[in-house]
């Protein structure tokens, strides 16, 4: 029973770790399906994390924090769009530039406003954080060994943003494959000239895609600083935006396979946390440096085997111009 409990707790940790990855990966899916490379996922998440924590600490309301996080990420997304859609700049450079800018700007503003070394105040007041939602009969269900513990630990006790991320996958699949907007969005990423010939604005669709990406990155960043943690710290995204991009590529720009990739990466991250300081048979205690690198090593190995077979949208990374 103790082993089973540890497995359930590991799966619960996997869900919590997968949430920001999934939100960012679906955000990148909308953007890249429209033909815009989204290397700014990391920066948008980081900017949203700072804004959400700062506003939540200042106002005492996590909902104001969520709004600030989304607004910040959307602003950064539009900034990237202005550079690479309107002015047809290099999409990789635009995304990386925003990420580098936010990585320095967030701690600088935090130091100027709060004087806490680039951090925000701890979010320990009522209403400043997203807390777990206990579902009906969760406490009673713990007495039932298998389904009850799964219900009590996996389904119950998660915060609202986790449930939103879970609903996002079928929602994104429906939008992309069952709506006119999704059809046009995918067409822009494959053949923008055909879309333009049909009288549809290519740039307009791409801007809508990057705005959706900004909204979802805003939710992901807000989750990091107001749900997974109790405030903002420097570099708190820790490469999650790039892991989300890797999961998106591994999932071949499709919602359900991308969910599987996010869960796999999150499981290795959660497992790495559990393995720290634990003596394993034959090898003994694994060095903590190797354990921390495990999710990224797995990412490289998986992409080395699958990226060649993953077909990206044909027009991705290509600025559109009617003259060409």
What are the language-model segments listed below?
Residues 227-296:
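Transmembrane alpha-helical segments in multi-pass inner-membrane proteins
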Residues 1-24, 37, 51, 58-64:
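Membrane-interfacial amphipathic/re-entrant helices at transmembrane-helix boundaries
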Residues 60-107, 269:
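Alpha-helical transmembrane segments within multi-pass membrane transporters and channels
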Residues 153-232, 255-256, 260:
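Helix-loop-helix "hairpin" substructures at the membrane interface of multi-pass membrane proteins
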Residues 172, 190, 197, 201-204, ...:
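Cytosolic-side transmembrane-helix boundaries in multi-pass membrane proteins
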Residues 18-27, 43-50, 71-79, 189, ...:
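Hydrophobic alpha-helical segments embedded in the membrane of multi-pass proteins
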Residues 103-149, 272-282, 308-317:
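Extracellular/periplasmic helix-loop junction at the C-terminal end of a transmembrane helix
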Residues 29-48, 85-98, 184, 208, ...:
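Short, non-helical or kinked segments that cap or interrupt transmembrane helices
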């Amino acid at each position: 029973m103790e082993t089973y409990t540890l497995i359930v707790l590991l799966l619960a940790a996997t869900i919590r770790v997968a949430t920001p990855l999934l939100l960012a990966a679906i955000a990148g899916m909308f953007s890249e399906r429209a033909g815009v490379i989204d290397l700014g996922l990391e920066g948008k998440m980081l900017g949203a994390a700072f804004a959400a924590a700062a506003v939540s600490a200042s106002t005492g309301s996590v909902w104001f924090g969520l709004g600030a996080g989304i607004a910040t990420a959307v602003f950064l997304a539009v900034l990237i769009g202005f550079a690479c859609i309107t002015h047809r700049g290099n999409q990789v450079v635009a995304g990386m530039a925003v990420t580098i800018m936010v990585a320095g700007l967030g701690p600088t503003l935090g130091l100027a406003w709060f004087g806490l070394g680039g951090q925000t105040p701890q979010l320990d007041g009522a209403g400043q954080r997203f807390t777990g939602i206990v579902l009906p009969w969760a406490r009673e269900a713990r007495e039932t060994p298998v389904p009850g513990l799964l219900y009590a630990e996996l389904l119950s006790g998660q915060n609202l943003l986790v449930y939103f991320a879970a609903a996002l996958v079928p929602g994104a699949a429906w939008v992309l494959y069952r709506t006119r907007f999704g059809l046009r969005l995918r067409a822009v990423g494959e053949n923008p000239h055909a879309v333009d010939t049909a009288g549809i604005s290519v740039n307009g669709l791409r801007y809508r895609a990057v705005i959706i990406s900004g909204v979802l990155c805003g939710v992901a960043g807000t989750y990091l600083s107001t749900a997974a943690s109790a405030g903002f710290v420097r570099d708190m995204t820790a490469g999650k935006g790039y892991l989300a991009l890797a999961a998106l590529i591994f999932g071949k720009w499709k919602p359900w396979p991308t969910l599987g990739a996010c869960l796999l990466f999150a499981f290795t991250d959660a497992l790495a946390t559990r393995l720290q300081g634990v003596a394993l048979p034959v090898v003994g205690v694994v060095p903590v440096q190797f354990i921390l690198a495990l999710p990224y090593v797995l990412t490289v190995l998986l992409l080395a085997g699958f990226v060649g077979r993953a077909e990206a949208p044909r027009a991705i990374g290509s600025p559109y111009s009617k003259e060409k």
